[in-house]
Amino acid sequence: MRRGAVGIGTLIVFIAMVLVAAVAAAVLINTSGYLQQKSQATGRQTTQEVASGIKVTSVIGHVDTTNNAIDKLAIYVSPNAGSEGIDLRYTKIVLRSKSQEVSLYYNRSNYYNGAVDNIFDISGVWPSNGYTFGIVVIQDSDNSVQQNYPTLNQGDLVALTVNANAALGGIKPGTSISGEVIPEQGAPGVIEFTTPSTYTETVVELQ
């Protein structure tokens, strides 16, 4: 009887161990599936964030020959490949010199959509202050870059206009400027240039 009881007890313990192992395996499988799904979702989100964003295609400066300094900046931007629409109302420009940093936001009063010969000759697109920027539409086949709701889509190209005198006190020769064009979502566009040691033209390609 005692041996039988011991045998039954051992069997019960064995069955209990098997059940515990089965439950643990089920928990591990469920956890593994959850983590895999979460990892895939995170990967998709990260890929979208990397793909979306804005890029700076060029930066052009206008030289005030009287003060020998750049008084206007035209920052040309377009969406990254695979990017969704970028609302320029919620995009900001950050500019840094050695001595200061400024942030600029869109002012719908400084907007232009029409023929462009010399961007620096267009009136009404250059802010009078150092904390806003304007928009000059260069290419917009789907008419998404509207004055009140300027949305940058694939294939669009605009110039963001900055009053460099008001924002940075003018940009002298040999000055290093850095910054970003930061959309509400996605990767920012990078601004990085050093002005020439001398200004020989009134229009200077900086980046």
From Swiss-Prot:
Keyword line = Archaeal flagellum
- GO cellular component entries: archaeal-type flagellum
Broad class of the protein's primary localization? other
Show the Pfam families listed in the entry. Answer: Arch_flagellin
One GO BP: archaeal or bacterial-type flagellum-dependent cell motility
- Known NCBIfam families for this protein? arch_flag_Nterm, PRK08541.1
Q: Which PANTHER family match?
A: FLAGELLIN B1
What protein is this chain from?
Probable flagellin PH0548
Species of the source: Pyrococcus horikoshii (strain ATCC 700860 / DSM 12428 / JCM 9974 / NBRC 100139 / OT-3)
List the taxonomic lineage. Answer: Archaea, Methanobacteriati, Methanobacteriota, Thermococci, Thermococcales
